[in-house]
Amino acid sequence: MSLLDYFKSKKKPSTAVMAKERLQIIVAHQRGQRDTPDYFPQMKQEIIAVIRKYVQISDDQVSVQLDQNDANLSVLELNVTLPDR
């Protein structure tokens, strides 16, 4: 195998492989959201409303996630991208 063959052999992954990877990411994301409580969407909107009292932000600047590690532990993660002053 020559040095040129080594560089030529690298090919882009097929579209089927890329589609499969994307689908796996989407399914994993949806599985994570499946176990969220019923009150979670309303709680998220109320948190955004409180933040808007002090800072002008849009919905896409706020990320709220609920991670349930086990039956006794839940973690509410809130990420807010604040505008520049």
Swiss-Prot record:
GO annotation terms (biological process): cell division; regulation of division septum assembly
Spans traversing the lipid bilayer: none
Domain of life according to the entry: Bacteria
One Pfam short name: MinE
Keyword check for DNA damage: no
InterPro entries linked to this entry: MinE, MinE_sf
Keywords from the named record: Cell cycle, Cell division
Gene3D superfamilies linked to this entry: Cell division topological specificity factor MinE
Recorded family membership: Belongs to the MinE family.
NCBIfam families documented for this protein: minE, PRK00296.1
Record's function text: Prevents the cell division inhibition by proteins MinC and MinD at internal division sites while permitting inhibition at polar sites. This ensures cell division at the proper site by restricting the formation of a division septum at the midpoint of the long axis of the cell.
Record-given protein name: Cell division topological specificity factor
Originating organism: Shewanella baltica (strain OS155 / ATCC BAA-1091)
Gene that this sequence comes from: minE
